Amino acid sequence: MAKKILVMDDDPTIADLLREALADEGYETFMMTQSLRFYDAVREHKPDLILLDLMMQYLDGRDELKLMQMDDHNIPVIVVTAYLDAGKEEEEFRKAGVVKIVYKPFDLDKLVELVRSIIGGPEGKTA
């Protein structure tokens, strides 16, 4: 069974780019562009990894991380953001499950390799 990745970005172009690149690698991907159903999507799909934009419309990425932390989800999160000060909050993010902060614009191939290094290949194999 393929590993599942939830891609969440309010820019549909970026979300679809990430979703498609990871699906091409063999991962099962789910894309969201609005944060209102984030928590429901996490519970429904039970992803192995989340790619999360910090600056979202209703709930921002920080709120979503707090919701996950309150429910004791142990899902690794890669924050993908244009918010250049995100590094100043790195310790707080790490407590909430963030394993890496990637700044936009990003190198897509390097991001895919980062995903593979965190959760292994789509079927659980390491690179």
Q: Predicted segment positions?
A:
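The feature encodes the CheY-like receiver
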Residues: 15, 57, 85
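Charged docking surfaces used in two-component/phosphorelay signaling
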Residues: 16-24
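Short hydrophobic/Thr-rich beta-strand motif most characteristic of the beta2 strand and flanking loop
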Residues: 26-33, 41
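Residue-level signal for the "D+5" position in two-component response regulator receiver
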Residues: 31, 58-59
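Active-site beta3 strand of CheY-like receiver
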Residues: 45-51
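Hydrophobic/aromatic residues positioned on beta-strands within the core alpha/beta folds
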Residues: 80-81
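C-terminal output helix
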Residues: 106-115
